[in-house]
Amino acid sequence: MEQNLKTIFYAMGAMILAPQTLCAQSVNIEGLDSLRLSGSVSVVEPELLKKGVLNNALDALSGQTAGVNVTTNGLDRIAMLNSVRVRGTTSIMGGNDPLVIIDGVTSDVATLATIYPADIESFTVLKNASETALYGSRGASGVIQVKTKKGTGKGFQISYEGNYGIEAMYKSMEMLNAAEYIAAAQKYGLEYNNKGYDTNFRKAITRTGNIQNHYLAFSGGTPQSNYRASFGYIDHNTIIRSKGYRNLVAKIDVTQKAFGDKLAGDFGVFGSSFKNNDIFDSQMLFYSADAMNPTYPYDKLNGSWVKNGAASQVNPPGAVLKERNDTKNMNFNAHLKLNYDMTNSLSVSAFGAYSYASNENNQFCPTWVWAQGNLYRGEFKSEDWLANVSFNYQHSWGIHNLKAMVGAEYQKDIRTGFWTSAKGITNNDMYYHNIGAAASRPFGGTDSKYEDPTLASVMGNVDYTLYNKYSLSVSMRGDGSSMVGNDHTWGFFPSVSLSWDMKQEKWLRSLKEITMLKLRTGYGRSGNLGGISSYTTLNTVRQNGIVSVNSSPTVTMGMISNNNPDLKWETRATWNIGADLGLWNNRLVLTAEYYYSKTTDMLYAYDVPVPPFAYDKLLANLGSMSNQGLEVGVSFTPIQKKDMELNINMNLSWQKNKLLSLSGEYDGMQMSAADITAMGALSGAGQHGGYNNVVYQIVGQPLGVFYLPHCKGIIEDGNGHYRYDIEDLDKNGTVDLSDGGDRYIAGQATPKVTLGSNISFRYRDWYLSLQMNGAFGHKIFNGTGLAYTNMSSFPDYNVLKGAPEKNIVDQNVSDYWLEKGDYLNLENLTLGYDIPIRKGVVQSLRVSASVNNLATISSYSGLTPMINSYVVNSTMGIDDKRTYPVYRTFSLGLSVQF
């Protein structure tokens, strides 16, 4: 059923960013033919993808649909995406990144980030288990389907898109300058080093950044035989000196029909080369730039870096900039799909794909920063073969419509890696290019790996519609994996969904105000193998030393994991119910959906006794976790005229996560993890001693809560210094700052509510768009403020303006530095103009100007509240001296169609 929706709206079950006209309610399953879903599919106009300069393809997805969170790396915001989360965290160890399918080929978020944004025709995000169950053991964390542009068959066409932007820092830490530093030291009678300079180290390590994107595409042919080729280039010099990346992408697609259009073939080739130049220790760089004595010089003096021997946790920022952490990623993919219509109702489809990826990582830490220096080089490669075949049947008779599919699939990966490290550098000029000249190689610093997992699958789907208004969809997928235990080789993942198109009822047809009204519900199960490797079910060993045997050096081996033949898939079961309402020819569209999911057989590494176990950790399926939420989408077009149009779109997502259990029985033995376990702490540069655990996993609570002492205020210690007044919560007469002591649950790191919004206005050939996103209901621990206000480290380490007046000499964590993380970010403002031209060689011409990261509205006192609030690791919810400088991007764009 074709839908040509003029307005823009967000569906909760699946979301598509695509042109207005497409076959709604269908998804593509890795090269298999499209299947009708009784869940909802929404159309978002291409204008919403225009965000000025896009670093990568997933920038276009950020904020566009409820329940999908795209976050940049907590260390920087240059380009590479650290995570994508679909309806939150569903596992501790099993992995939480969604499955990515690019033109039917299994992929990942990292590969998607290398695709040129203008090459993408549509995103489809599957969130409900009734859809993700079609992907079986890989769909538990959601699925992002990407369809790239193909030839149109409308004759020869050329298109060019280009953007150029500059980046300017507009917010940084306000540290003491040289005069303020000297005055504060003299005020308190402290000895200090004065080198006679007044250096702003943050300014010294930054620059005006620039980014340019260029994209050229050719297409031609007829509807029966057509092609499309495209080339993209991104060059980004960031605001941090010596940091930047380049991405080169090429893509070719050919489509051919034959035998009276009964046979259709699609062949595509994709390749990309991504080079990234980075710093090895960004936290060290930013902390050194902030905390370095401002009377010290930035550059070398007499050929040597000037270091403060009393400040062992910092290094001259110029020296830290000499560190290297460079990567080079190469991706290649080729796929072929053939579809043959055997009859009017029956077709057969075959799909094959080959993917190759290589990653080189080279690291260099000079002796100016590390005592002996450090070198590392590693190379990792992967090859993936994917093949499937399916039979598709479709038949309509009277009031009935039936679609069915059965298929089989086989996938094999080969993953290899080699790496080596060395120290004892005698010459810093060679960087990592002469690793053989290093004096020593740490034991265990050279290693390699090999994995070859396989996955075989069978699947089927039946979709039945009655009266074109009642729909039932049932699917089943069985996956057999080489990575799980022998007793659990096969996992089965069913789903069922129902929908009711109420607008088709006679009693609603007469209500012209209602354009669309649909109810839907579904239940399904999907799996997750992310926490299991090829050899996890086996006892594994590695070298742990070298001894002399008969005067010959002999490597000794030690156990590094226990075998667990009972390992199996994590399983996520999801139930959802939702509704879609369109009024006044869809000028107002409302969508809402509630979902509840539960992950069982959740993987966790348990402490076990030795003996009877050979190793002190065991990976087992004993835990469980739940997620529930409500997602609401609103689209409103208050003005819709020939020369003027205004669209307002918003999506809201409420989410609640809960860690249900980490205990159970394994082989007759009761196992349980600690109810309270620290996940993240203040550490590294500038944090010396103290009880510094901040974020915890606690059974019965959301994953990632702040478990902190309560600070009643600041008190004087009698010496003119001030300390945090910690409350004795258990009233036993002493204050215990350790885990389980005088601590309480003070909030959660993950937002309870997220928001995405797009407002677009068109007047004749001019258009203006504003895109916003926000997060609410969570907290951030301002570890940067704690460290930079601590006067016990002064004057060895510089402090924030205002810190000398407070004179706090305490670094223990408490809720004093726990702040609301709520924010509303004005992500992009774009003004564009479609230049009127006479139709000739040039078919269309558009120019635009954009500002990215326009402003952030927040009460948070740190640099930015947009830190890692979603990825479960040691940085979750903690602002700990890692914050990348806040900058804006101003860009100009040009789009030409020939």
Predicted regions and their residues:
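Short, small/polar-rich motifs associated with maturation and membrane association
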Residues: M1-F259, L263-S272, V306, P317, ...
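Conserved small-residue
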Residues: S159-G196, W419-S421, A620, T637-G747, ...
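Acidic, glycine-rich flexible loop segments
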Residues: Q283-P317
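Glycine-rich, aromatic-lined ligand/substrate-binding cores of catalytic
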Residues: Q748-I780
